[in-house]
Amino acid sequence: MVSSVGAASEVQLYLETGRVKVKNQGKVRFLSHSDPLNPLIVELELGEQVLTGKNTRARIEMREKEEEIRLRVDTLFKVNSLDLDQTEVEMPTGKARFKIKRKLNRKKKQRRKFNVRTVTALVGVRGTEFVMGTS
């Protein structure tokens, strides 16, 4: 899904240590890195799935660091949409720590929505920092 705001430069994967698999429409990339002080930074496209491996430390930053997700080991994660009024991500399995800075949309005078879709639920986030796990 491509949105009016969503661009490849708006979603970055920071791989500090370990391995991740990035998959998009049949294309697979394997990334590994071992320097936590200088993370490997990879631009992600909307719809790309990220699967973290064992002993992996990785985070995803969106909207110029307004939305940060720290992925734990064995987590499958995907950014579905980045629209002007909402962000939707998907986490079928795994665990992650979310940190969301909810800025006011000046045109609509409301805060941008942040939704997390799991296998069993769609969660609308109202808080700013939380941990979520699913299996």
Outline where the language-model segments fall:
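Flexible, surface-exposed loop/linker segments and immediately adjacent secondary-structure boundaries
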Residues: 2-135
